[in-house]
Amino acid sequence: MKQLIILIFLFNFMYAYEFKLNEKEISYINNSSKKTFILNRLKKYENMKTEIKDYELIRKLSHVNSFMNKIFPAHDISTKASIDYWATPKEFLIQGHGDCEDYAITKYFTLLEIGIPKEKLYFAVVDVKGERSSHMVLFYLENKKSTPLVLDNLSSKVIPLTQREKLIPRFAFNEIDSYKFTNQKFTEKVKINWGEENKWEKLLNRVYSLNE
């Protein structure tokens, strides 16, 4: 049992997240014509994390959601050569724009950094009634039987999924597992078919291993 506890601790330590700029990013910022704006945004981001560290859960979720949602939305096709590019939190905050995946990703890693357990956070791919394209949001769940709280770049409020009537979740995933969603609940474990490129594994490698 003692060995198991040590292994779990080491696993969690290896995959702990810390927002820390590397030399390449520092050089980019220093040479950017938007240096002042970038530094101001990053300073506010660090101040926000410090301020909310001891807040109760719902206030933490709401502050992170609100802070990120102030960043300018932009579709991949207008910002990147690759369609459906998933930016790291540092890319998102330095560039100052992104699409729904980028908001969800940065909220996820920010919440990890201030102590929210990763097993309680899930990325959810949803359909939005009246819209043709899929959308991504971040779910917070106390457990898999509870109603998710939704962090969405299209909404300033963090509210239960049952109150977001236009959202129809298809599946949800995190670093641990992935599930199909039926009738607003987790149902069965599924293996996601990412196609030619597993964007999720690639993102995790860039964040944890390459410090991008």
What is the predicted role of each segment?
Residues 1-2, 57:
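Structural motif marking the loop-to-transmembrane transition
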